[in-house]
């Protein structure tokens, strides 16, 4: 829901790509720092309390991001927004692993599919509101209202407990947990590129108006959602390793299409391929973490989430730096090469 705001923030504050990338780094730092804490808090107070508190903080940040013109306040708000998002992501995955294991069924892709559905509704909805001439601030107030209504409906069904606290709040990942974390790192980096730079790419390099730039992330989120909603059946049919291999190849091809064919239609097609390719890699990785015995679950889930989200921490800033000294196209192609590495890694992972 925040992706369509990026071009407005860039334009309102007169930021170049390098500065924007550094500011987006604040969001990643907030996420990274909150995740180990979220795992410990979920173990102590339960998933429900932490998910409710983190979502409320997100709702407080969104209207500020739509209006801020002060650089220090923008930095602080991005940090808090990132920390809140990190709390939601980590705790939701803790709950998902618990539920999947208790059910004895393959469910992780479906859970992540609903997360992606929120990306579609948020990005496309905000883009639609902005295209009607509604101000960014008013659009965010509408989003906040709808989010709080949904939270009130969902909260009673969230788990009042988390994973048992069998270890420290954070431990350096090792063995298969580290390997899974590195795969997640690359995929999250690619997702961060779509979230933070897809709109800028469309407006700066493909001549798309700012009010429609959010469609880039909406297309990415749409194919990711479809892939995940059907992902549990796909994983059962072809196996976890093939899902990672084929997904990495598809996502790499998508970034190449978006970058090398200089029309906005090709960019949207490329974003669609990236979403489809990345859709089930991370869910498969989280399921694998729930089955591994190298590290306690209460430590392993926050650990791979933290390593994975380091991709979002490093990715936007690195892409902004490369775009500043060279080009955004080169930055996207580097990410494509990294996704080829994910495909290779998928053949080595024991799931």
Go through each PLM region and give its residues.
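Helix-to-loop junctions at the C-terminal end of transmembrane segments
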Residues: 34-46, 130, 227-239, 323
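Helix-loop-helix hairpin linking two adjacent transmembrane segments in secondary transporters
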Residues: 110-159
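Cytoplasmic helix-loop-helix junction between adjacent transmembrane helices
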Residues: 78-113
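Short amphipathic helix-loop junctions that connect adjacent transmembrane helices
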Residues: 4-18, 196-212
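C-terminal ends and interior cores of transmembrane alpha-helices
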Residues: 56-69, 250-262
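Short hydrophobic/small-residue motifs within alpha-helical transmembrane segments
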Residues: 28-29, 116-121, 221-222, 226, ...
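Helix-breaking motifs and short loop linkers at transmembrane-helix boundaries and internal kinks
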Residues: 14, 46, 67-72, 207, ...
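Primarily marks hydrophobic transmembrane alpha-helices of the MFS/SLC 12-helix fold
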Residues: 48-51, 244
């Amino acid at each position: 829901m925040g992706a369509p705001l990026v071009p407005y923030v860039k334009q309102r504050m007169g930021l170049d790509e390098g500065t924007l990338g550094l500011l987006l780094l604040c969001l990643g730092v907030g996420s990274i720092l909150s995740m180990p804490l979220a795992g410990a808090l979920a173990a102590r107070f339960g998933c429900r309390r932490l998910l409710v508190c983190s979502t409320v903080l997100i709702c407080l940040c969104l209207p500020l991001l739509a209006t801020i013109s002060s650089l220090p306040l923008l930095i602080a708000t991005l940090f808090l927004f990132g920390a809140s998002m990190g709390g939601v992501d980590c705790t939701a995955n803790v709950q998902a692993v618990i539920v999947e294991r208790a059910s004895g069924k393959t469910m992780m892709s479906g859970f992540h599919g609903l997360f992606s559905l929120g990306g579609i509704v948020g990005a496309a909805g905000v883009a639609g509101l902005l295209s009607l001439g509604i101000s960014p601030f008013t659009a965010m107030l509408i989003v906040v209202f709808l989010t709080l209504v949904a939270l009130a409906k969902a909260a009673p069904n969230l788990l009042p407990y988390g994973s048992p606290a069998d270890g420290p709040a954070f431990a350096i990942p090792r063995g298969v947990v580290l390997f899974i974390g590195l795969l997640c790192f690359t995929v999250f980096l690619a997702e961060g590129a779509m979230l933070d730079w897809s709109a800028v790419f469309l407006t700066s390099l493909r001549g798309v108006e700012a009010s429609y730039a959010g469609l880039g992330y909406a297309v990415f989120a749409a194919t990711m959602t479809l892939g995940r909603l059907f992902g549990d059946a796909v994983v059962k049919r072809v196996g976890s390793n093939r899902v990672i291999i084929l997904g990495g190849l598809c996502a790499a091809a998508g970034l190449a299409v978006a970058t090398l064919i200089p029309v906005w239609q090709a960019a949207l097609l490329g974003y669609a391929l990236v979403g489809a390719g990345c859709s089930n890699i991370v869910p498969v990785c989280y399921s694998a973490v729930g089955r591994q015995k190298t590290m306690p679950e209460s430590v392993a889930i926050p650990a791979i989430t933290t390593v994975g989200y380091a991709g979002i921490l490093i990715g936007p800033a690195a892409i902004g730096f490369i775009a500043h000294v060279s080009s955004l196209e080169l930055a996207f192609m580097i990410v494509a090469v990294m996704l080829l590495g994910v495909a290779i890694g998928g053949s080595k992972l024991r799931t």
